Amino acid sequence: MKNKIKFANELLDFIYKSPTAFHAVDTIKKVLNKEGFSELKECEKWNIEKGKKYYMTKNDSAIVAFVVGNGEVHEDGFKIIGAHTDSPTFRIKPNPEMTSEQSYIKLNTEVYGGPILNTWIDRPLAVAGRVTLKGENILFPETKLVNINKPIMIIPNLAIHMNRNINQGIELNRQVDTLPILGLINDKFEKNDYLLKAIAKELDVDYKEIIDFDLFLYEYEKGSIIGIENEFVSSGRLDDLEAVHAALEGLTQSNVSKATNVLVCFDNEEVGSSTKQGADSNMLANVLERIVISLNGDREDFFRALSKSFIISSDSAHAVHPNKGEKCDPTNRPKLNKGPAIKIAASQSYTSDSNSSSVFKALCSKADVPVQEFVNRSDERGGSTIGPISSTHLNIRSVDIGTPLLAMHSIRELCGVDDHYYGMKVFKEFYNL
């Protein structure tokens, strides 16, 4: 079994290679290819075999990987872990170039998801995403990933001398206060297509070949292991790449079992999941049904398989805050490095119930992993996640769990080194059943 610190450093490497959902899927694919998985295309007929390993992608930003069990799928079902590839950030708008004070070059952006806005101020920022190029088939243009891994932007604060009330709290305007500066106007500056030309240079293509883009900002600096005893992981995008990384390790390092082991990494969780690659789609259901059909089953066999299946929906949980303990529930107070937290809500914003929670608790016991429970304060409205959304498309028992975090949706979130290791252990135990 891997050393905890080594595994945490592997997480930091994984996150840094994955500045966007597109890059996360690309990083996952590289791991899967190395581990002997074969890629399936949606447009092709699937001929899968028991004991073999496969994956398919959607929109370059979501992925489903699976190891076909050696049992009968309608009798042994699927063991599924779900997570998501996206994180709160800023998306660059079309025609983004702006000038200010006849001096600065700025980019026009919009907020993606629910970031803690002030944590993005005064940070060196880079840009990454997907670029669409002219192709031979007008309906299927060529796409390329781009990552300008340089500190090329920053969102500067307003000096306290010009904003005396800043330490009493101030609301940031998303159209005014959070636009990054890219540089200074000089004699060579041409406003039109300024960013496209920089992207084209990075990709070594003619900028006129670029039709469109999906580009996002990210913190340039890599995450780190911190704490007097190296207890913590400090990084952006822990929500939810921490779960993706732990589940990926669990899938690739587990044995073939009777059931078919599945890892699904959805996109767009942070904006509601209502996309073709999100949890509120038939993406996962279609993949599972195609697995059954390829194994010579029919639709009734598919429904039988679902009744024998189980989903662990893994999305970050809230740890009790050291300075704001009153924000946590009085009796359910997850702590860092005390194990994954089962997420429970009377509103059904989480899928956990006594049955599915008992399954996860038994798994943790078998893996020798501590387990906690998270419930919101009764006077606080919490978030939701992929679990209840995907449950509307699949009739499968499900539990919502997550690694406890501090500063969720900050540009730098915090989790426990032990907890990331615990997550991997229980996921591997689940897949080995």
Curated annotation (Swiss-Prot):
SUPFAM superfamilies: Aminopeptidase/glucanase lid domain (SSF101821), Zn-dependent exopeptidases (SSF53187). One of its GO terms (cellular component) is cytoplasm. Keywords: Aminopeptidase, Hydrolase, Metal-binding, Metalloprotease, Protease, Zinc. GO terms for molecular function: aminopeptidase activity; metallopeptidase activity; zinc ion binding. One of its GO terms (biological process) is proteolysis. Disulfide bonds: none annotated. Zn(2+) binds at H84, H161, H409. Its EC number is 3.4.11.-. It comes from the Bacteria. Its cofactor is Zn(2+). Pfam families: Peptidase_M18. Gene3D superfamilies: Aminopeptidase i, Domain 2, Zn peptidases. NCBIfam families: PRK02813.1. Belongs to the peptidase M18 family. This is Probable M18 family aminopeptidase 2. It comes from Clostridium novyi (strain NT).
